Amino acid sequence: MAFGKVKQVMGPVVDVEFEGGELPAINSALRVSNKFISDVEFNLVLEVAQHLGDGVVRTISMDQTEGLVRGEKVKALGTQITAPVGREALGRIINVVGEPIDEMGPVNAKEQWGIHRTAPKFEDQATAAAMLMTGIKVVDLLAPYAKGGKIGLFGGAGVGKTVLIQELIRNIATEHGGFSVFAGVGERTREGNDLWQEMKQSGVLAKTSLVFGQMNEPPGARARVALTGLTVAEYFRDVENQDVLFFVDNIFRFTQAGAEVSALLGRIPSAVGYQPTLATEMGTLQERITSTKKGSITSVQAVYVPADDYTDPAPATTFTHLDATTNLDRDIAAMAIFPAVHPLTSTSRLLDPTVIGEEHYKCARDVQALLQRNRELQDIIAILGMDELSESDKLVVSRSRKIQRFLSQPFFVAEQFTGLPGKYVDIKDTVKGFREILDGKHDALPEQAFYLVGTIEDAIEKAKKLQA
């Protein structure tokens, strides 16, 4: 075990000098004492990022560096940052370096895995396409998720990404019955606490492992916590042969943390100030999230879109890795239609008749065609008004408005906001409901009857109450 000393501290970046002998490898962990964190010796973990020459390595800190002094003794561990893996990690909350943060004592895991791992080889990967039911109408109908696929929830600030990811955790984890891993990357501590309480109440916590590196953590922790979470998920896939759900909120913060550290490491920034290694870092993470012949990892990732600009390099780089995208739209949220999913810009490679069946495919395409026609008519309506439309176009507008409202749904995790019980809708009921609206069976019902209901039967019931 080699020892060195702190040479200089620049925010989250620490230079460490080793005299003679071997230098610790890139991505290996070092430990140093920081009295500001606690009185425990060697309580701060550093990760080697660069070799500068003359026995000096540049490292990124996983916790605060306030209180570190030059000349402080540093211990090279000779290993990477490791995470506790296996069933002992279920029901627990750990941080980026694998330490428990739920005040429930140590995680007595039999194994610790390094967080930097190689992606599965091509011959080990499984590629069969099957649909993952979410119980959310707009998702299942128009942009269905793939089992063992990668899904992105895109949206700007405050359009409902976290609520949607919490609903997906509740629906899929409860119905799915396998293991889940949640990585909280650079998001609000309050949301993490809410999620933990929610999971405890719903009984899902015993089959879930949570890994948190919240907004208040230094960029080093936020840039690595997704890898820690993924390592926990990989163990369940590779060793226990499980189908694992891996939730990440928010993948943008992973990129953001990398950008914060990049300049301090002396790299010249690329477009919009992001790190020049953006595509490489994203690829390294995303390529590990895949299905193998042993088991699968189905990943749902929330992606913050800065200033609602989808051409920003961070969301644009994420797009290329995904099987399905659920785009949350501010204009739809402004209409109070929740989940605020845009039915025309959300995509999925599973929207294919050979995978989801002819009936589902035809219904989804007909819904999109009707909504697109309605969108084209909006300009005419804005200038001339509804009265100038032909009878067939008036019918298009009327049915579109009903479909828009029927795409909304009361969520289980939002019951305290809506005052309505949550609804899980089976795909057969979803297709049946939208087909009936398209065929004009419910032209006589008021628009309001379709708002925040589950199945078409619920809408008919609501219409009776409204007319009573």
From Swiss-Prot:
GO terms for cellular component: plasma membrane; proton-transporting ATP synthase complex. ATP binds at residues 155-162. This is ATP synthase subunit beta. It catalyses: ATP + H2O + 4 H(+)(in) = ADP + phosphate + 5 H(+)(out). Pfam families: ATP-synt_ab, ATP-synt_ab_N, ATP-synt_VA_C. InterPro entries: AAA+_ATPase, ATP-synt_VA_C, ATP_synth_F1_bsu, ATPase_a/bsu_AS, ATPase_alpha/beta_chains, ATPase_F1/V1/A1_a/bsu_N, ATPase_F1/V1/A1_a/bsu_N_sf, ATPase_F1/V1/A1_a/bsu_nucl-bd. Produces ATP from ADP in the presence of a proton gradient across the membrane. The catalytic sites are hosted primarily by the beta subunits. F-type ATPases have 2 components, CF(1) - the catalytic core - and CF(0) - the membrane proton channel. CF(1) has five subunits: alpha(3), beta(3), gamma(1), delta(1), epsilon(1). CF(0) has three main subunits: a(1), b(2) and c(9-12). The alpha and beta chains form an alternating ring which encloses part of the gamma chain. CF(1) is attached to CF(0) by a central stalk formed by the gamma and epsilon chains, while a peripheral stalk is formed by the delta and b chains. GO terms for molecular function: ATP binding; ATP hydrolysis activity; proton-transporting ATP synthase activity, rotational mechanism. Keywords: ATP synthesis, ATP-binding, Cell inner membrane, Cell membrane, CF(1), Hydrogen ion transport, Ion transport, Membrane, Nucleotide-binding, Translocase, Transport. It comes from the Bacteria. It is found in: Cell inner membrane. Belongs to the ATPase alpha/beta chains family. Its EC number is 7.1.2.2.
